[in-house]
């Protein structure tokens, strides 16, 4: 048991180093490449994480480049790496303003034109919608974690916050839901852990909701939760 715990900790340290060094290199290239499609080509270097760590990301479904809003559950820092590595479009993340203020790391967001929101600002929703329109006009699909923060990677999602709903309704967006399974087992920063586990990205079929229905957002969460549970039980049986 102690041997397994030590092994998991050492694996986590190695993966943390791969992420830290890789991110540093990508940020440098992003700076010089930032005017070229928001450095999308250098951001794709996130795929090196998988070859350097031996992690195999199982992918089910396909990316729909016609979808303008991507919603997915959140477990780990790796969730961002998963999409940055493989999504074919110049995606734009919607993240907390505090992340952009982290020394050095913040450049990964600010140099690439991501949307940073101030949750404490009562007028923040106006700024958010203005920024979303700007990115949509640039043909950049928006990506948001509707839970708003990292979950624990168990069976249940955290309650969805209203941000994704407001954005989708305002711009009548086609949505592609996605679910991530076991990314927290591949790398968890608090506590520092990493396991040998299967991990999967499931890309559900895109659709434009019936925005006149008062329950469409709850139905989206139920759909994602159901799909997540199916794969969660399969990978963790």
From Swiss-Prot:
Protein name, UniProt field: 1-acyl-sn-glycerol-3-phosphate acyltransferase
Pathway listed: Phospholipid metabolism; CDP-diacylglycerol biosynthesis; CDP-diacylglycerol from sn-glycerol 3-phosphate: step 2/3
PANTHER family cross-referenced by the UniProt entry: 1-ACYL-SN-GLYCEROL-3-PHOSPHATE ACYLTRANSFERASE (PTHR10434:SF59)
SUPFAM superfamilies per the UniProt record, alphabetical: Glycerol-3-phosphate (1)-acyltransferase
GO MF term (any one): 1-acylglycerol-3-phosphate O-acyltransferase activity
Subcellular location: Cell inner membrane
UniProt remark on domains: The HXXXXD motif is essential for acyltransferase activity and may constitute the binding site for the phosphate moiety of the glycerol-3-phosphate.
């Amino acid at each position: 048991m102690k041997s397994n715990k030590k092994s998991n900790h050492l694996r986590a340290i190695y993966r943390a180093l791969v992420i830290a060094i890789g991110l540093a290199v990508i940020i440098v290239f992003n700076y010089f490449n930032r005017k070229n499609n928001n450095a999308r080509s250098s951001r794709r270097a996130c795929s090196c994480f998988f070859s350097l760590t031996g992690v195999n990301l199982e992918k089910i479904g396909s990316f729909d480049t016609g979808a303008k809003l991507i919603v997915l559950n959140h477990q780990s820092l790796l969730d961002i790496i998963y999409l940055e590595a493989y999504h074919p479009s110049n995606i734009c993340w919607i993240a907390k303003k505090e992340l952009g203020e982290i020394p050095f790391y913040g450049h990964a967001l600010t140099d690439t034109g991501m949307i940073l929101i101030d949750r404490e600002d009562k007028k923040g929703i106006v700024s958010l919608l203005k920024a979303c329109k700007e990115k949509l006009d640039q043909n950049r699909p928006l990506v948001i974690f509707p839970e708003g923060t990292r979950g624990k990677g168990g069976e249940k999602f955290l309650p969805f916050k209203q941000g994704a709903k407001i954005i989708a309704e305002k711009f009548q967006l086609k949505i592609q839901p996605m679910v991530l399974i076991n990314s927290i087992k591949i790398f968890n920063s608090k506590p520092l852990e990493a396991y040998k586990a299967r991990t999967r990205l499931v890309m559900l079929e895109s659709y434009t909701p019936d925005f006149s229905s008062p329950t469409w957002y709850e139905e989206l969460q139920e759909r994602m939760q159901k799909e997540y549970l199916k794969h969660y039980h399969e990978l963790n049986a």
